[in-house]
Amino acid sequence: MAAAAAVEAAAPMGALWGLVHDFVVGQQEGPADQVAADVKSGNYTVLQVVEALGSSLENPEPRTRARAIQLLSQVLLHCHTLLLEKEVVHLILFYENRLKDHHLVIPSVLQGLKALSLCVALPPGLAVSVLKAIFQEVHVQSLPQVDRHTVYNIITNFMRTREEELKSLGADFTFGFIQVMDGEKDPRNLLVAFRIVHDLISRDYSLGPFVEELFEVTSCYFPIDFTPPPNDPHGIQREDLILSLRAVLASTPRFAEFLLPLLIEKVDSEVLSAKLDSLQTLNACCAVYGQKELKDFLPSLWASIRREVFQTASERVEAEGLAALHSLTACLSRSVLRADAEDLLDSFLSNILQDCRHHLCEPDMKLVWPSAKLLQAAAGASARACDSVTSNVLPLLLEQFHKHSQSSQRRTILEMLLGFLKLQQKWSYEDKDQRPLNGFKDQLCSLVFMALTDPSTQLQLVGIRTLTVLGAQPDLLSYEDLELAVGHLYRLSFLKEDSQSCRVAALEASGTLAALYPVAFSSHLVPKLAEELRVGESNLTNGDEPTQCSRHLCCLQALSAVSTHPSIVKETLPLLLQHLWQVNRGNMVAQSSDVIAVCQSLRQMAEKCQQDPESCWYFHQTAIPCLLALAVQASMPEKEPSVLRKVLLEDEVLAAMVSVIGTATTHLSPELAAQSVTHIVPLFLDGNVSFLPENSFPSRFQPFQDGSSGQRRLIALLMAFVCSLPRNVEIPQLNQLMRELLELSCCHSCPFSSTAAAKCFAGLLNKHPAGQQLDEFLQLAVDKVEAGLGSGPCRSQAFTLLLWVTKALVLRYHPLSSCLTARLMGLLSDPELGPAAADGFSLLMSDCTDVLTRAGHAEVRIMFRQRFFTDNVPALVQGFHAAPQDVKPNYLKGLSHVLNRLPKPVLLPELPTLLSLLLEALSCPDCVVQLSTLSCLQPLLLEAPQVMSLHVDTLVTKFLNLSSSPSMAVRIAALQCMHALTRLPTPVLLPYKPQVIRALAKPLDDKKRLVRKEAVSARGEWFLLGSPGS
């Protein structure tokens, strides 16, 4: 029995010896993994592996010893978690001893120590022992890169798990690491080494007397000068090294006396990258430095920064210089001073003011902006700095404004003033009387009002911005100042067309200031606008002149712009709605553009109300019933219908009202939306008009039952409301509503109504939760579509219903969407519906504005376009190849629409297979196909030049042909593509250069300015092709 057991035990050991022999002597690599796997599975122990290695570990031949230790180390790397404490002790002693061995053995020894540094069972004291042995026995920088990396890994492992033990070494550990790192050149190792240095400092290891040595061993790499080789497999970028080294240099104030002179030297050098790196590093240092570290270097730092901002041609250097100055000032501002200490901030700011003040007064104003930027960078660092600089600079700038008479000079000075005023907004003052602006308020207001009355538009624009900033200062402006300001803004809001930018700025400023000073604007602006509106109504009655018409439009825009406070909305909204009623009641010459302008103002007001729940609900419950009442009244049959009533039912006007209702509904809370829906749905289904103002109508409102097209057209307003509701709002009588919508969607007598019904049905389908009721609605829709698509007068309406239902399901990833898309694809071959089906793919891929929007709470999956592309483009391509010649353009059009709206990163990998079809689409006579395809190709020329250059001959020919297209939009797009072609590799393009330059001479004489502009741009790029520096 004993003999049998011995044989069984000997058999596996024999296998182990065989594997060891194959690795050590046979130089095979595979056995190491096998041995490690056997140890992990429990077939062998580490001790048995050591015994099997036996004499190989003591072999007089270094290479044999190295192979034996390599095998043991590889086993330990895989199995270090299995080791017991006593095994770790013996292995550590063995490996430490082998550090004295032949240099060929050292790499394998280090691998073993790396494995042991990961052991949880490592007894206390051994980490210190290992590192001492490495520091003493190994000349690390003579090792290959991979072995140096192993040493850094050993140190990192011990720092992570044995921090207190290593700290017991005191400064000896720091000195040992300095020796290890000294002379390191490989970027892979430097990243690890910099991280170790950072940890030494941030985790409070003792640096002892070696602070300067540690600084020297890291700062010698500053600034980083490293360019990664092409196709670098390690992926290390120069920026990685820069940031890692910067983290070290800026990690401790103890480096300051060595680092600051170095930074000053590099800022003053001629190397742009060194300047940038130094200024960014200085910026980082200021976060940890105090006055003590900066004190002796402040004059030199200021001189260097000043010189760079004054003299540099690089915007990046200027920006970094200003950022560094800001950080320096912030650092000096936050330092706590002793009572007897010098206030370095005060003296530093005095130097800045002394060097910059006189430039603000120079007649030629050459260094005005650099000086202002420096002063603003310092002033923006702290409240104390801001007060000091502002109180010194503002009197000077105010004086200069009055000294200079030219508008351009005054604009420059006012822009500088504006910069300093904006900085004041950063700081709050408990005692408003201490605010430095108080003493200059009257002068500032006077200066701003002068700017607002200046003939120069540019000066007026700066004046408006300055007024807005002054107004944002709490309790600065008096009531009289505000009254004057409102008067100026009123005047500027009615400027002529050539001052459009000023008018827009004035409207924006009115909105900003009205939110802060609602009483002033209610008292002084709203009454004036109300009067202006009344005058506008009178002019409409008389048949107005164009100038009066434009004033009326300006008034409407001003009313919406100023509606930024709940109290003002309660005044301005009734004015606009009353205006609509007045137009309705009077004998005014109402045009659709007038009503659309009012609706646009209402929509803008609704957008502003979205920020405040109270205003949002007020607008909704006030404006929506009013608009619905006007529309319902307009839809009623009358013997002599008024002009307005006809206007209110026009497509464009209804679309404008849809926009108002949708905007006013999207931000309602579910509770308030639920209140509203109980009124509006019954209005359309049951004719319940009780909640409408002035609801005495001559007949019942029954849009679904009534035969009049006027009432049916108002389904668009129902759509705007119900399709903007939050998803969790329950819609009353939903089943009846969906059936009525479905029935109306296939009514051929009024395309506008049927389309609105189809969109409304689709919008509700998209939000409806999955379940039996949704399935029933879908089945009804499919049956209706199939019935309508047969022969008959409703084919077009059935197709529209199919399209919108498909879109609703595509957006939410509903399983039926693939069947409906396939049905749509089948219609591409239909003689009557084929072109419309092709355009339908544009609708499926586009964002809508009135229904199925994220803002309207529709269920829109993030990557629906990518999914649609993956699921359907192969079928489109296949269908194109199989289609008869007369149908192919429909497939090309559909494909072009899909690709044009696809995110380019998704399209690029598929480009080689699809490009031939896109090029064929350029030959399609349909302008829509051409434009869509050109829009798709232009970004691809910029992002995939290598693929596109394979087809350069075809591209040049087709783009040049299309540059003479009858369609202006196609001509412009073709010329933009010709411009983009110049991004392809120059050698590929040069043979075509003469031909292209000749061909592009023709569109230079195009009758349309925008075409000529693109032609000049494209031809200029082709002229430069191949020239030096291009």
Curated annotation (Swiss-Prot):
The modification Phosphoserine is found at S1027. It comes from Homo sapiens (Human). GO terms for molecular function: enzyme binding; nuclear estrogen receptor binding; protein-macromolecule adaptor activity; signaling receptor complex adaptor activity; transcription coactivator activity. Ubiquitinated; undergoes 'Lys-48'-linked polyubiquitination by MAGEF1-NSMCE1 ubiquitin ligase complex leading to proteasomal degradation. This is MMS19 nucleotide excision repair protein homolog. The modification N-acetylalanine is found at A2. It comes from the Eukaryota. Keywords: Acetylation, Activator, Chromosome partition, Cytoplasm, Cytoskeleton, DNA damage, DNA repair, Nucleus, Phosphoprotein, Repeat, Transcription, Transcription regulation, Ubl conjugation. GO terms for cellular component: centrosome; cytoplasm; cytosol; cytosolic [4Fe-4S] assembly targeting complex; membrane; MMXD complex; nucleoplasm; nucleus. Its main location: nucleus. It is found in: Nucleus; Cytoplasm, Cytoskeleton, Spindle; Cytoplasm, Cytoskeleton, Microtubule organizing center, Centrosome. Key component of the cytosolic iron-sulfur protein assembly (CIA) complex, a multiprotein complex that mediates the incorporation of iron-sulfur cluster into apoproteins specifically involved in DNA metabolism and genomic integrity. In the CIA complex, MMS19 acts as an adapter between early-acting CIA components and a subset of cellular target iron-sulfur proteins such as ERCC2/XPD, FANCJ and RTEL1, thereby playing a key role in nucleotide excision repair (NER), homologous recombination-mediated double-strand break DNA repair, DNA replication and RNA polymerase II (POL II) transcription. The keyword Protein biosynthesis does not apply. The keyword Endoplasmic reticulum does not apply. Component of the CIA complex. In the CIA complex, interacts directly with CIAO2B and CIAO3. Component of the MMXD complex, composed of CIAO1, ERCC2, CIAO2B, MMS19 and SLC25A5. Interacts with CIAO2B; the interaction is direct. Interacts with ERCC2/XPD; the interaction is direct. Interacts with ERCC3/XPB and NCOA3/RAC3. Interacts with RTEL1; the interaction mediates the association of RTEL1 with the CIA complex. Interacts with BRIP1. Ubiquitously expressed with higher expression in testis. HEAT repeats lie at residues 866-904, 908-946, 949-987, 990-1028. GO terms for biological process: chromosome segregation; DNA repair; protein maturation. Pfam families: MMS19_C, MMS19_N.
